Amino acid sequence: MRIGIKNILAGIVLLLSTCLVTAQPVIKTPAKSIKEFMNKRFGMFIHWGPVTLRGTEIGWSRGEQVPANEYDNLYKEFNPVLFNADAWVKAAKDAGMKYLTITAKHHDGFCLWPTAYSGYNIMNSSFKRDIVGELAKACKKQGITFCIYFTVLDWHDPDYPVHRKGKDTEGNMTAFVARMKNELRELITRYKPAMLWFDGYWETPWTTEYGKEIYSFIKSVDANVIVNNRLGKDFSGLSAPGAVGDFLTPEQTIGKLNMSEPWESCITIASQWAWKPNDTLKSLKQCIQTLVKSASGNGNLLFNVGPMMDGRIEARQVERLKEMGNWLKIYGESIYGTSGGPFVPVESYGATRKANKIYVHVFERKGDELKLPALPGVMIKKVYFLKGKPLTWKQDESGIILQLPSMP
């Protein structure tokens, strides 16, 4: 066994004599764009802003743990002098991540780029540097795909009618949406994101009609930009009448096996999206199994870190990500560019596939044998550990039995 397999999971390869046919997902953007995005399988999510000065949750702590007026003025103190875009992107690359998504604007309305359409932005903080721009440049330099998070609600904007734990206003959604388009045009044309990750759809001022309007606007600016499904309010499926977007986004949970619609789970490495002092970190086993279970379900994992107030990602988070990257250096073949299945993921195992290979990932060993469902019409040629010895196996009409070696 190689390092990491003993206590985390086993990667077993079934070499088939017949290739399996995979259903093609229904998509709204060019097929090439979606395919390239889904093949990446693993990305970094970054939630960051002035709220790190308090160590509470971004957006949601406004008017809760932090009084709204105090929260809205944190930007004046925000001066993350140790921020280094290259270091962030390197941490993502060392983790084996293929793309990065930054919260350009979260629900608190603070913009991490020098927008011309709101004074509540990074250039009016003590820092006065274009966070989004520096990250976009660093991603391009290091070969990481750059993506942007943007919310459709803004509890700071007087034109938005609902202000969480603050004074509600009558608002002006026409002006709000017009300004949103201007901000999105800036982000798309200036930073060239491959994907836009929307949020904030649930409040009553936002409607599916607004979502469709924004989706069409984005496509008019750049038809190749991928958009997640949070512009609309119908999540029964991408083809539903009220659905808007190109891929599904389960949050803090792993999506189920879905061969017809692309999806990406967003999950935190700790308990909170934004940085929290002494937050509980997921174990390496949890991190790797979260990634593998996502791929086994035919989805991507957008794994979140929250940088600290000084601009650095916590050293222990960087180290945990690097450990994931070390595992992927050995077993990445079973993750990148694969499809989920053909077996439905269960508690003890999941599977991915590519060409004439099935990669079986063992999460929990329950004996010396692993019983897999039958594969009608498919004949197995051999079974072996991805980076190790062959396994004894048996196939008949009732299923496939793998003999697992004894563990030291």
Where are these regions (language model features)?
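Bacterial Sec-dependent N-terminal signal peptides
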Residues: 1-26
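Mature catalytic domains of secreted/periplasmic carbohydrate-active enzymes
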Residues: 24-408
